[in-house]
Design a protein with these regions (language model features):
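Transmembrane alpha-helices of multi-pass small-molecule transport proteins
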Residues: 1-35, 62-63, 118-123, 139-157, ...
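Hydrophobic/aromatic residues within transmembrane alpha-helices
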Residues: 43, 69-75, 130, 137, ...
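Hydrophobic residues within alpha-helical transmembrane segments
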Residues: 27, 31, 58, 80-84, ...
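Cytoplasmic-side transmembrane-helix entry/capping segments in multi-pass membrane proteins
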Residues: 20-28, 75-87, 132-142
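Helix-helix packing/entry segments at the starts of transmembrane helices
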Residues: 50-58, 127-146, 175-214
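Hydrophobic transmembrane alpha-helices of multi-pass small-molecule transport proteins
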Residues: 2, 66, 75-97, 142, ...
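Juxtamembrane helix-entry segments on the extracytoplasmic side of multipass membrane proteins
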Residues: 17-23, 95-117, 154-172, 219-229
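Specific transmembrane alpha-helical segments of multi-pass solute transporters/efflux pumps
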Residues: 9-51, 55-56, 92, 174-192
Length: 244
């Protein structure tokens, strides 16, 4: 993010930015780039991956509820139903249609993942209110996330260098998954409604399935078609507005 900011502006921040702008964006970075992942990775470490993945995808639903509070967006009951069906489609895809695969590990893991999901939902909603230019905003939120992660590391763990085998995936993850993707997500948040943004998130498991099946030759289940169709229909309903 620092390199992108430098190439676009030479690390020159908008002179009109005030102290409260910086603090607000650093706070958002703590929510969406640090606390979210800390709670989420704790869940994956301690709990069942299917359980965690399902609870993780509650954040778009939480985002819609928060949008009605902070952004005063009207809760369209039909869109809410469509989003709920989209979530059910995700549930079918993740469990391959077998609900018995869900094993709840314990209340601590569930609350941790739900809290992490809430952090990212709140981050997404409050990001719509930011007046900072998108590249500067991206730099500030990752800087805020770095500060919070460093403090958490100092208080609760110790620093360890990744192995050579782990280094490349970490770099790719940092640049694309937790880097460039944020710019597109923030751009979408400022362009369309909260509900439309939320339903688009449900496309990600469908896209992931395509890559996994194509590149890793994973087994294909009929439930993928059923769940994916539900997600697609729900999404098309929510995105029927012209600006979507």
């Amino acid at each position: 993010m620092g390199l992108i900011l430098y190439l676009s502006r030479g690390l020159k921040f908008d002179a009109s930015l005030k102290k409260n702008h910086y603090l607000y964006n650093l706070f958002l970075g703590s929510l969406g780039c640090a606390l979210y992942y800390l709670f989420l990775y704790y869940g994956y470490y301690e709990g069942n991956s299917i359980e965690v993945l399902i609870l993780q995808y509650s954040w778009p639903l939480q985002m819609i509820l928060l949008g009605s509070i902070f952004m005063k967006e009207k809760l369209d009951p039909f869109k809410i139903i469509a989003v709920f069906f989209g979530f059910m489609g995700i549930l079918i895809i993740i469990t391959t249609g077998d609900i018995n695969q869900i094993r709840f590990t314990g209340i601590n893991v569930s609350l941790s993942v739900l809290l992490g999901a809430f952090c990212f939902a709140l981050f997404s909603i409050l990001s719509k209110k930011s007046e900072v230019e998108i590249f500067q905003f991206s730099f500030l939120i990752f800087f805020g996330g770095t500060i919070t992660s460093t403090l958490a590391l100092g208080f609760f763990s110790t620093f360890q260098l990744p192995s050579k085998k782990e280094l490349l995936p970490i770099i790719i993850n940092g640049i694309f998954i937790n880097g460039v993707s944020y710019i597109f997500w923030l751009k979408a948040l400022k362009s369309i409604s909260v509900t439309n943004s939320a339903i688009l998130v449900f496309f990600t498991p469908v896209l992931s399935l395509i890559w996994i099946i194509l590149f890793f030759k994973e087994q294909f289940f009929i439930s993928y078609i059923f769940g994916g169709s539900i997600v697609l229909i729900s999404s098309l309903y929510c995105l029927k507005e012209k600006n979507s």
